[in-house]
UniProtKB/Swiss-Prot annotation:
The lineage of its organism: Viruses, Riboviria, Pararnavirae, Artverviricota, Revtraviricetes. Specific enzymatic cleavages in vivo yield mature proteins. Envelope glycoproteins are synthesized as an inactive precursor that is N-glycosylated and processed likely by host cell furin or by a furin-like protease in the Golgi to yield the mature SU and TM proteins. The cleavage site between SU and TM requires the minimal sequence [KR]-X-[KR]-R. Residues 304-324 are annotated as: Fusion peptide. GO terms for biological process: fusion of virus membrane with host plasma membrane; symbiont entry into host cell; virion attachment to host cell. It comes from Bovine leukemia virus (isolate American FLK) (BLV). The chain crosses the membrane at residues 436-456. The 17 amino acids long immunosuppressive region is present in many retroviral envelope proteins. Synthetic peptides derived from this relatively conserved sequence inhibit immune function in vitro and in vivo. A lipid is attached at residue 455 (S-palmitoyl cysteine). Gene3D superfamilies: 1.10.287.210. Keywords: Cleavage on pair of basic residues, Coiled coil, Disulfide bond, Fusion of virus membrane with host cell membrane, Fusion of virus membrane with host membrane, Glycoprotein, Host cell membrane, Host membrane, Host-virus interaction, Lipoprotein, Membrane, Palmitate, Signal, Transmembrane, Transmembrane helix, Viral attachment to host cell, Viral envelope protein, Viral penetration into host cytoplasm, Virion, Virus entry into host cell. The keyword Glycoprotein applies. This is Envelope glycoprotein.
Length: 515
């Protein structure tokens, strides 16, 4: 009797233990996304002179906020080094100049939606449409830029260029959330130096950005080639907010104009083509929710809720596993039934062929006997001696045919159930055995969750909190020029020139407004 061979199907660990992975993922806190928006609105008065004025967003208050903010601890400290109240200001590198003086952004790890680098304001949906002023016209223009940032802990630099002579600037700085915008008083910088306007603007920063800490990022200052002119602009015109050009500029030969830009002085204010030019340092916005310096608070998690969720997922996956196993068992049983039918047909055909072969052998033996009897009656010997040939007989082997009758049914030789590691049968049906196996697997999974899941959850949460508490680190860049650098100090030695910075209100009474 041959030994029965029982096939074993290996368990599928993905189906058995995937509930543990889902449980741990469900217990992890998702990292919240955060977005800040910057809005710059400026209002200017246009006169007969179509001039280009460049304004930017940096002043002494940003130094104070930087030095006092605990979120800028890893950045270098600054001192308010100014002359007659005018602090250090910088100019960013140009990034694609377009018509009307619109300048794009200089971005690092922040991702602004608009304006695009190299695009002018009419190509960007976040710019308000504005028409160029006609000669001799007088009107008020309002521009708003909405700057959407995906990562507010990065660095961004913005240059805002407008047209006009000695413009009246009104700025607002706010987030753009779904709820109503922050309510703070509108700034009014009527005919005051532009630098003081930025001071008023930055005083509102704390209210405008309730979720942001503003840090001033050190960056090498650059000036575009447009500032390198060897000419004189008279100050006897309708009144400039800045002194004459030759006071601030040195000889053109002092600069290497082949590169298109140079290092300006740290305290330099420019008068460009009868326009006002201020310089802009990079500004960084730090998310207060992720850069908080306060000690982390311990949050107690409910292990009962976590285990309940894990057990619920395990029960659901176990039910799926039982259903899949039952369906597989049914299909395997159907296959075995079909194979048994085919096996029975083959055995019947082989037995019939063997029976026919036995009949042929019987007929051959009968013919031999008849021929031998005929030869003997005629006086001869039997057939074989008469024809002088050896006699042959047909012998049929029946051993292999007999073994076919000893075969057990296929359903008794092939197991449709997974018996490992519980190799028992107990006369139970397949459904009962599969259910018992699933319940035992669920019990082992519950024990695993009870002993190891709390430890894993604690490790994951502590790691996430550690990552969230890490404040962004900004590189410390020295603002002091090297001795061998071509850093050009353009300020004159006499500080009395700043007395000319006091603005003069132009006489626009005789000007007629635009129809």
């Amino acid at each position: 009797m041959p030994k029965k061979r029982r096939s074993r199907r290996r368990p599928q660990p993905i189906i058995r233990w995937v509930s543990l992975t889902l449980t741990l993922l469900a217990l992890c806190r998702p990292i919240q996304t955060w977005r800040c928006s910057l809005s710059l609105g400026n209002q200017q008065w246009m006169t007969a002179y179509n001039q280009e004025a460049k304004f930017s967003i940096s002043i002494d208050q940003i130094l104070e906020a930087h030095n006092q903010s605990p979120f800028c601890a890893k950045s270098p400290r600054y001192t308010l080094d100014s002359v007659n109240g005018y602090p250090k200001i910088y100019w960013p590198p140009p990034q694609g100049r377009r018509r009307f003086g619109a300048r794009a952004m200089v971005t690092y790890d922040c991702e602004p939606r608009c304006p695009y680098v190299g695009a002018d304001r009419f190509d960007c949906p976040h710019w308000d449409n504005a028409s160029q002023a006609d000669q001799g016209s007088f009107y008020v223009n309002h521009q708003i830029l909405f700057l959407h940032l995906k990562q507010c802990h990065g660095i961004f630099t913005l240059t805002w260029e407008i047209w006009g002579y000695d413009p009246l600037i009104t700025f607002s700085l706010h987030k753009i959330p779904d709820p109503p915008q922050p309510d703070f008083p509108q700034l009014n910088s009527d005919w005051v130096p532009s630098v003081r306007s930025w001071a008023l603007l930055l005083n509102q920063t704390a209210r405008a950005f309730p979720d942001c800490a503003i840090c001033w990022e050190p960056s090498p200052p650059w000036a575009p080639e447009i500032l390198v002119y060897n000419k004189t602009i008279s100050s006897s015109g309708p009144g400039l907010a800045l002194p004459d050009a030759q006071i601030f500029w040195v000889n053109t030969s002092s600069f290497n104009t082949t590169q298109g830009w140079h290092h300006p002085s740290q305290r330099l204010l420019f008068n460009v083509s009868q326009g006002n030019a201020l310089l802009l340092p990079p500004i960084s916005l730090v998310n207060l929710s992720t850069a908080s310096s306060a000690p982390p608070t311990r949050v107690r998690r409910s292990p009962v809720a976590a285990l309940t969720l894990g057990l619920a997922l395990s029960v659901g996956l176990t039910g799926i596993n039982v259903a899949v196993s039952a369906l597989s068992h049914q299909r395997l049983t159907s296959l075995i039934h079909v194979l048994e039918q085919d096996q029975q047909r083959l055995i019947t055909a082989i037995n019939q062929t063997h029976y026919n072969l036995l009949n042929v052998a019987s007929v051959v033996a009968q013919n031999r006997r008849g021929l031998d009897w005929l030869y003997i009656r005629l006086g001869f010997q039997s057939l074989c001696p008469t024809i002088n040939e050896p006699c042959c007989f047909l012998r049929i082997q029946n051993d292999s045919i007999i073994r076919l009758g000893d075969l057990q049914p296929l359903s008794q030789r092939v197991s449709t159930d997974w018996q490992w590691p519980w190799n028992w049968d107990l006369g139970l049906t397949a459904w009962v055995r599969e259910t018992i196996h699933s319940v035992l697997s669920l019990f082992l999974l519950a024990l695993f969750l009870l002993f190891l899941a709390p430890c894993l959850i604690k490790c994951l949460t502590s790691r996430l909190l550690k990552l969230l508490r890490q404040a962004p680190h900004f590189p410390e860049i020295s603002l002091t020029p090297k001795p061998d650098s071509d850093y050009q100090a353009l300020l004159p030695s006499a500080p009395e020139i700043y007395s000319h910075l006091s603005p003069v209100k132009p006489d626009y009474i005789n000007l007629r407004p635009c129809p």
